[in-house]
């Protein structure tokens, strides 16, 4: 097999001249045109004498194993895909790829070695159902996506300090990751990986969006600001401790974490959008949000909690729904908050196991009743239906997960009670 676009005549002549007149036959740079495709090791051997290749290189076809020798830089992208017989690949001399490193649909690939790779724009590893090892010396990258692989470790990314996108999903044998990331300018997402995934992002100070699903343990020891949305959905976390976090710019969602019994956000003062805590069956005492002062959207807290401490709350620009099945929960403090004008949206609902209070803030009528009065049923019925939608949508099937799990969502802000529920429901689809 031949390259679709072979080395340029200039590069070949350069190599020949060096072979005739020098002790080395390695040209400093070889151009492969805009792009070239290699379907055999013999094709790769033609450029093995180059320290730099210019252009986009694609490797595909029936290769049992393949290697790029001597090449230190690719001024372009390297794509390895759709090779049903490729079992291993190595390019241990490459230090820099100015474009992307793409590996996709390599069904028997067990190892990929880029031991010297320090810089790349993006790495995309998708549908690698046999891979067990992937090694790099990565220091700089903009985007990392690892999806549908059998990797047990992604330590090849552990030294990265900053990225735009870090998305690790549907890797069923991946159970732990310890990161050195300090900032994420677009999104950090972990979802549908191993059943007992343990994560540590203790150097992370700032992120734009964070969404975690199907995680067993998480540590954010230094996180201070989330510029947009923060979501913890369908996890098996026993606790959440984000004690350095002071601001979430848009929505904060803690939904369907069945084993969560403690949430500590002791320095959080501002949630810029919707704020929802829902369907966390073991979360009986919610006292870790006692410094929250403003919520820029709606607020919803539903579950079986007996204690809810929002003692610093001064302003909710949307509606409010507080619904506990525990008869030990008291609405008194929240009703006082509403009567003082802090709830600025179109409705206020507060229920416990025995009483219900519903207020249509757009009108002058207010009703309180025992055991679900008619006015409360009207106002909170839609909320119950919406919350059921949240619960029903909290997981979707994934072909590579052991259990049904959904893709990581982008959570959006809301400006009313129904808005925040609808926003989270849409996000979880």
UniProtKB/Swiss-Prot annotation:
Q: How does it sit in the membrane?
A: Lipid-anchor; GPI-anchor
* Entry-annotated residues carrying Phosphoserine: 339
Q: Where is the composition biased (Low complexity)?
A: 361-401
Enumerate the propeptide ranges: 407-429
**Signal peptide per UniProt:** 1-19
Give the CC-aspect GO terms: extracellular region; plasma membrane; side of membrane
Q: Which InterPro entries match?
A: CWI-Assembly_Regulator, Rcpt_L-dom_sf
- GO biological-process terms attached to the record: cell wall organization
Q: Which UniProt keywords apply?
A: Cell membrane, Cell wall, Cell wall biogenesis/degradation, Glycoprotein, GPI-anchor, Lipoprotein, Membrane, Phosphoprotein, Secreted, Signal
Q: How is it modified after translation?
A: The GPI-anchor is attached to the protein in the endoplasmic reticulum and serves to target the protein to the cell surface. There, the glucosamine-inositol phospholipid moiety is cleaved off and the GPI-modified mannoprotein is covalently attached via its lipidless GPI glycan remnant to the 1,6-beta-glucan of the outer cell wall layer.
Compartments in which it is found: Cell membrane; Secreted, Cell wall
- What's this protein's function? Required for proper cell wall integrity and for the correct assembly of the mannoprotein outer layer of the cell wall. Important for apical bud growth.
Can you say what this protein is called?
A: Cell wall protein ECM33
Q: Which gene encodes it?
A: ECM33
């Amino acid at each position: 097999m031949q390259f679709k676009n072979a080395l340029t005549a200039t590069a070949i002549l350069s190599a020949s001249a060096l072979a005739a007149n020098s002790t080395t036959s390695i040209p400093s740079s070889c151009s492969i045109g805009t792009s070239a495709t290699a379907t055999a090791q013999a094709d790769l051997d033609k450029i093995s004498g180059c320290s730099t290749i210019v252009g986009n290189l694609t490797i595909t076809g029936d290769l049992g194993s393949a290697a790029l020798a001597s090449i230190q830089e690719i001024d372009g992208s390297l794509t390895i895909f759709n090779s049903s017989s490729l079992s291993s690949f190595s390019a241990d001399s490459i230090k820099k790829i100015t474009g992307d490193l793409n590996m996709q649909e390599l069904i028997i690939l067990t190892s990929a070695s880029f031991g010297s790779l320090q810089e790349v724009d993006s790495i995309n590893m998708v549908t690698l159902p046999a891979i067990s090892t992937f090694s790099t010396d990565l220091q700089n990258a903009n985007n990392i996506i690892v999806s549908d692989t059998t990797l047990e470790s992604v330590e090849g990314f552990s030294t990265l300090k900053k990225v735009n996108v870090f998305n690790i999903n549907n890797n069923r044998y991946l159970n732990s990751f310890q990161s050195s990331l300090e900032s994420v300018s677009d999104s950090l997402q972990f979802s549908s990986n191993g059943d007992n995934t343990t994560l540590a992002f203790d150097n992370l100070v700032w992120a734009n969006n964070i969404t975690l699903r199907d995680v067993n343990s998480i540590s954010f020891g230094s996180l201070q600001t989330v510029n947009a949305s923060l979501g913890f959905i369908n996890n098996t976390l026993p606790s959440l401790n984000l004690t350095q976090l002071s601001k979430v710019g848009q929505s904060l969602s803690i939904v369907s974490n069945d084993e969560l019994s403690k949430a500590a956000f002791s320095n959080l003062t501002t949630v810029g959008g919707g704020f929802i805590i829902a369907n966390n069956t073991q979360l009986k005492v919610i006292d870790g949000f006692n410094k929250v002062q403003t919520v820029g959207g709606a607020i919803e807290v539903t579950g079986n909690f007996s204690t809810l401490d929002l003692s610093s709350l001064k302003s909710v620009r949307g509606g409010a729904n507080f619904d506990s099945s525990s008869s030990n929960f008291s609405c008194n403090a929240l009703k006082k908050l509403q009567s003082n004008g802090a709830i600025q949206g179109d409705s206020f609902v507060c229920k416990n196991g025995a009483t219900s209070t519903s207020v249509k803030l757009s009108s002058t009528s207010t009703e309180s009743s025992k055991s679900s009065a008619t006015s409360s049923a009207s106002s909170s019925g839609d909320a119950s239906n919406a919350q059921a939608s949240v619960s029903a949508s909290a997981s979707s099937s994934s072909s590579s997960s052991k259990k049904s799990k959904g893709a990581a969502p982008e959570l959006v802000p809301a400006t009313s009670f129904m808005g925040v529920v609808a926003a989270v429901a849409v996000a979880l689809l």
